[in-house]
C-alpha cells in the first residue's frame, strides 16, 4: 500500500527489482504479480470494517455503568470505532475508485454500516464521501468528552506523550488506567479532525478542509509542540546510507510529526519486516551499510513554511 501511495523512492533499478512493488507504484492492479495482494488488501480492510460495525452495535446496547469511566469511556470507544470505519472506507475509496475530480458517476466501493452484511452494494463516489464525513463528524463529537479535557489534552500534547505506552495519567491528578495511555495509537479528537481535513480536501471542499487543518495546527501551537516539526536526517536518499548517517536520526519513527499511527507488535518477525533492515551491503573497506530498502521519497509540500 505504501508503494501505491508513492511513499518510497523506487527509481534505483539496481536495488528495486521486485516486480510487485514496482507494479503497485504504477497502479497496475491487474498484473498477475499483484492480484493476490490486491485481493488481500480488500479482504483485510473489510474485515476491519466488519469488526468496527460489530463493536458499534454491541457498545450501543451496553449500559454505561459497565465502563470504569462511565458514559465518557463508552462514548470514546464508540467514537474510535466510527472513526476506524470511516478511515478504512476512505482508504478503500482512494485505492479502488477515481478521485472526485475524475468522477465518472459509476459505483465502485460499498459503504458497509451494519454487521453482518454479506453482499453490500457499491455506491458512487460523492455519496460515499458524504458517509465518510458523517461518520467522522460523529466520531469527533463522541471522543471530545475525553480528548478535550485537561487529561486528554496532556495525553496528546507531544509526540512523546502520544506514542508512549507509559501511563502518564495514572497519578492522583487524573487517576486514569492504562486503557487511556498511548493515545497516538488511537483515533483521537485531533487525529479525527486531521483525517476530516484530508477527506474534505479530497472531496474538493477546501474551506472545510482548511478549517479542520487549522484547528489541528492551532492545537499544536498551544501545546508547545508543532505537528509539522520534521526531522528527516538519516532517512531520505540524500542523507547517505552509512551506519553513521542513520545514527544521526534522532526521531527515527517521526513521532514529532505523527498525530496517529497504527502498529503491529508481530510485524518485525512475523511479517518478515526484519529482512528489510539487514546490513548486507558493505563499502570497499568492509564497512557495513544500512539497508537501501524503502528509502523515503522527499516531497516538499509547502514552498513557504513560515
Question: Can you say where each PLM-predicted feature lies in the sequence?
Answer:
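Short, flexible, mixed-charge acidic loops at enzyme active sites
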Residues: 98-112
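Flexible helix-coil transition and linker loops at the boundaries of alpha-helical arrays
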Residues: 62-74, 142-158, 164, 176-183
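Conserved, well-structured interaction surfaces
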Residues: 17-96, 116-130, 136, 142-143
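Acidic, glycine-rich segments characteristic of secretory precursors and extracytoplasmic regions
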Residues: 1-14, 125, 237-241, 247
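Short coil/turn linking the two alpha-helices of tandem helical-hairpin repeats
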Residues: 93-100, 147, 202-205
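Hydrophobic-face positions in mid-chain alpha helices that act as interaction patches
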Residues: 157-169, 180, 186-187, 201-204, ...
Amino acid at each position: 500500500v505504501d508503494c501505491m501511495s508513492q511513499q518510497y523512492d523506487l527509481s534505483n533499478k539496481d536495488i528495486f527489482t521486485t516486480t510487485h512493488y514496482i507494479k503497485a507504484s504504477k497502479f497496475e492492479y491487474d498484473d498477475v504479480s499483484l492480484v493476490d495482494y490486491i485481493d488481500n488488501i480488500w479482504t483485510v480492510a473489510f474485515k476491519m470494517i466488519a469488526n468496527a460495525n460489530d463493536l458499534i452495535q454491541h457498545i450501543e446496547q451496553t449500559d454505561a455503568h459497565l465502563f470504569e469511566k462511565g458514559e465518557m469511556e463508552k462514548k470514546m470507544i464508540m467514537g474510535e470505532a466510527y472513526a476506524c470505519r470511516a478511515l478504512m472506507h476512505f482508504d478503500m475509496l482512494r485505492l479502488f475508485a477515481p478521485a472526485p475530480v475524475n468522477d465518472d458517476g459509476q459505483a465502485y466501493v460499498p459503504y458497509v454500516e451494519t454487521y453482518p452484511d454479506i453482499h453490500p452494494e457499491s455506491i458512487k463516489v460523492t455519496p460515499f464521501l458524504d458517509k465518510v464525513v458523517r461518520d467522522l463528524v460523529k466520531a469527533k463529537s463522541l471522543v471530545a468528552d475525553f480528548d478535550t479535557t485537561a487529561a486528554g489534552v496532556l495525553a496528546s500534547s507531544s509526540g512523546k506523550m502520544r506514542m508512549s505506552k507509559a501511563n502518564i495519567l495514572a497519578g492522583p491528578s487524573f487517576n486514569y488506567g492504562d486503557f487511556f495511555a498511548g493515545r497516538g495509537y488511537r483515533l483521537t479528537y485531533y487525529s479525527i479532525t486531521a483525517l476530516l481535513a484530508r477527506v474534505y480536501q479530497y472531496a474538493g471542499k477546501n474551506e472545510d478542509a482548511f478549517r479542520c487543518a487549522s484547528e489541528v495546527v492551532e492545537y499544536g501551537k498551544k501545546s508547545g509542540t508543532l505537528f509539522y516539526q520534521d526531522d528527516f536526517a538519516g532517512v531520505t536518499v540524500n542523507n547517505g546510507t552509512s551506519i553513521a548517517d542513520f545514527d544521526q536520526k534522532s526521531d527515527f519513527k517521526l513521532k514529532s510529526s505523527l498525530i496517529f499511527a497504527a502498529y503491529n507488535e508481530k510485524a518485525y518477525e512475523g511479517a518478515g519486516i526484519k529482512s528489510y533492515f539487514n546490513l548486507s551491503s558493505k563499502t570497499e573497506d568492509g564497512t557495513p551499510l544500512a539497508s537501501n530498502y524503502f528509502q523515503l521519497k522527499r516531497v516538499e509540500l509547502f514552498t513557504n513554511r513560515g
